[in-house]
Amino acid sequence: VVHGGPGALGTVAAIARVLSKDSGVIEPLQTSDSIPELLNELDEVITACCDRPITLIGHSWGAWLVFMYAAKYPQWVKKIILVGSGPFEAKYVSEIACNRIKHLSDAEGAEFDELLKRLNSDKEIEKGRLLERLGALVNKSDNYCAFEIDTEKEDCLPVEGDKYSAIWKEAAALRESGELLGFADRIICPVVAIHGEYDPHPVDGVKLSLRNKFKDFIMYTLGKCGHSPWKEKHAYQEF
């Protein structure tokens, strides 16, 4: 189970904990600061812990990471499950901000834009603190009716703003160039996508971009659900 962010270590622990009741689960923490290094790091964990192809679940940014991993190391992947993935094509990006603004006050929306600008600046030195504040706003804009998980505070490690900035620049460039979606041509396993209808990341940016790329693709859209289905009051059981 691969966390999002980038830099949001421990945020999918609740998923891993529930799944571990029925099967073995790995929750790798991303410690590198470039996409090639993250892919190598993930491969090292998988090859050290597994002796057969596995199912990879990625949330948010983590969905992209498992998508790229499945393309680069197809021999290790039985299936990928993309939860709350960002859109795979640049043409959908503008919808994210528009959808988030609808869920925030005017002041919060302005603050959100300013935080993103500062996080993407090479001159900013307090990126960890800024990312924490951004996370608080995202918690409001991206969730429908989320409940607090008892272990969340101890599960989650401090956010890493520098890693977010470095990795996200690479990831956004891959999407802008079309290379991100191009990874689909090398993925041979079944692909499942799970998306909340209230998630600001447009469902069409996943569904329409991927449905003709794979022979075995299934899309589930959850009602009354935001970006993190496992902690949504009305959707977690279906998830």
Where do the model's predicted regions map?
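Conserved hydrolase catalytic core segment
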Residues: 52-97
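Catalytic histidine-centered segment of alpha/beta-hydrolase-like enzymes
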Residues: 222-237
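Conserved alpha/beta-hydrolase "acid-adjacent" motif
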Residues: 200-206
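Flexible "cap/lid" loop of the alpha/beta hydrolase fold
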Residues: 80-121
